[in-house]
Each structure stands twice: as structure tokens, then as C-alpha cells.
Amino acid sequence: MLEQKKVTLEIAGIPMPSFVQLMLKQSINEHHYFEITLDIQAIEAYGVEIPEASKDWVGKKVIMDFGGTVFVGVATMVGLHRSGGTHGNIKVTGYSSTFLLESDHTCASWCNKSLSDIVKELTDKAGVQALVNPETKSKLEYECQYEETNFRFIQRLARQYQEWLYYDGQNLVFGKPQAGSTTKLTYGEDLSVLDVCSQTLARPIKGSSYHSVNDQTYNGQSPDTAAGQNTLGQAAFDSSLALFTAPAVQRAEPRITNKGELDAYFQRRQQSDSAASSFITGESDCRILTVGSIIDVHTAIHTGIGIHVKNSIGTYIITEITHVAGMGDSYQNYFTALPSSIPTLPCPDVPLPVAHTQQAVVVSNEDPKKLGRVQVKMNWQTGPMQTSWIRVLTPDAGTSDKVPTNRGFVFIPEKGDQVMVAFRYDDPNRPFVLGSLFHGKSGTGGGSSNKTKSLTTRSGCTLSLIHI
């Protein structure tokens, strides 16, 4: 059994000599949340009616040390609580440092940047320490943050690309980290409660994705084979697929450029959805545990007087843990853990944004692939932000047996033209030009009684149809 050290607390750079109670809830994919209760007489002058000395703690750093495992957060609320005629307590609540990424809902975009580039840019601006090493290494043609906080956008990226996401107490981890040290826990010693469970989470899925540049529709499906599961998880995976035999038909959430990317997406999607097929929950007094900790769980079987045989039931990674510490030296935690060999974690439970049609200005129509695409800049896109090369909707477009290309209406907007942009699947990452718009400086209408219909080129050549 590990030697247990006292939990220490610091708020706004001030060490707290004691506390009434401390609760810290940590979970993958989310901010961590804490509540601290302090005796009012240890902080405030006798008889205060409102917080005085502690009021300046709002927005300040909170550091908890569990004897080697450190948690860094920020206080977001301080209050004076009274009940039952007592003099009261000071309550401090707040979140992990990832809360600094909770900007207001905003829009931004990136062209030809990697997931690593995007996440590092956001965390650096917010002053959040991060360990960024996603499995998805390639540069993304276009990625859009749409009316989301910075943290919600990072959650959505983790969902779209099935990347690991959690806060380890000091760093935001994006991408599967290197395996750390393992902590041994034994039921009857460090563990007072242990539940070993399995559940039916696996489902078959299939779908398609269209790539317009080469006019290819790619089809793919989940491999329906468990990855990284222990024997209990493997059995649950197989039982689940036996229950749910009809594949769900879905579209790929990220933009796909080839068949290999689509197959990899459905594989990782199924791995993420079924990651918790086998799990354990427990109660422990081991204080060094946190989200991301690897534990080697043992049980002790009584085989005779004073004789116990210890057996390992496997190694697990903690995905959720709640710490509760009180006066004196009391401490307990409650955790959930998944097999440590799983390749992906359950993805964040966040909705995909729904993009609405919006106005933009054409910044280029010199399509390098000569496909009639344009680049546009929407009103919220500032600085170097703009779309990648996007298609233009036209009344008629295609080919024929005698016309291999450009059959139909070919009217590509000019640079500087105002256009309306829509989105396939309402996905902000899939914009296209819906049509062009006249404005107060570019349009004069159809003349008296709207009699004139005309077609005018950039050089001034005009075809007019005048109603008589």
C-alpha cells in the first residue's frame, strides 16, 4: 500500500492551513469542477456580512496537491454560506485551467493547417498548457469554428477525428499520450469497493463520402472487430453486434479525400463508440490518482488462515474520478476506468454546429485545378481567413456524349463580387456558393417597369431583352 500524504491547498498564492471539505470532479472530454468549503474565521474578520478578504479570489489560480499529483484550476465563484445559526463558511467553486478556453461563441477558420496547429494556436492564446500529439497528422484543407467557444470547438475536433481529449491536472491532453507509470491497487487494501462490468455498446455502421475534385463517391463500413479490449470487453462487443445486426447508415463527419480515410474513420468511430464495452468502478483512498492514470487492479483471494493470493484483473486507464477530502486527514475517491489498451476514448458528447446561409465576397476565381471554383471571405473571416476552393451552384451543369466538360451555364463570379454561401449538410466545413447578389453600388435593376432583362460580361458586352 502506498504511503498517503496530506492534501494541500493554495488559493491566489496563499496556502490554506486547513479546509472543511474539498471536492474535485475530473472527467475526460470535459472541464474539471471543484468545490471548496473553508471556515470563515480562518479567512475573514469576525462578524463580516459579505466576503471581504476572499472576494479577490475570483479569477485567481487554485492549486491542489494530493501528495504528488497536482491539480491547477481557476476560482470562478466565491460566496459566504450560512445556515442553522452558524457563523458560516466561505465556499469557493471553479474549474480546471481549461476554463480559460471558454470564450464567448465565435467563428474562425483555417486553411491547410493540421489539427496540432489549430489546437496549439487556441491553447497558446488562452494561456493553457497543452500536450498536443493527435493521431491525425495531415493538413486539413479547411476547418471552421462556427459559433462555438474555443473549448467546445476543441471538443468537436476530438469528436470528428476520434482523438483523445482530457485534462491531466496541469495540461490539456489532445491526442493519445505516451504511457506513464502504473499504480497498483488491490481490493481490500487500496480499494474498498470494486465493480467489474460490461455493456452492449458496439454497433455496425456504414456510409459514404463524396469528393468533388475527382467526382468519386467512397463507400465504407466499420470492421466489426474489437480493438484493445480485454476478454470481458471482447465478449460484450461480440454480443452487441449479435443483437444489432443492421448497420446504421451515416455520413463521415470530417471531409474525406480517399477510400483509406473513410475506412479509417469508420474504424476509429466504432472503436470510440465501443471503448467502454468493459469498465470498472471503484472507491479508493489512493490520493495520487487522476484522469489518465494507469492502474493495475488486483484482487486478494483468501486461501487459508493468514494466506491471500493476489491476482491481477488487468490494467485500466481512469476516465472519471471524484476526490473528496475533509478535515483532518480524511480522503476518498470514486472512479471509473476502461482497459488501458483501448486505441481511442469515448468521444465528447457535443453537437455538431448547424451553419446558416451567409454573405461573402469572392477573393479569387483563379482555380489552380481549372474546375470553376472560387475562394470567398465571409463577413466574420478576418485577416488571412478565407475558405478553401469551393464550388458554385448553377442552374445547369454536367456533361454529355458530345460535350465532355462545361455543359450548361458557366457563370463564375468575379473577384470582389458579393455572393451568398450555403453549406452541404449544414456543415460549416462544407461551404458552396449559392448565387450572386447585387448591392447598392453594383445594381440598377431592370429599368422602367422592370422591362429590361440583360446579360453583361466583365468587358461590357451586353445581351439585352427589352419587353415592349
Protein language model regions, located:
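Amphipathic alpha-helical and helix-coil boundary elements used as assembly
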Residues: 1-466
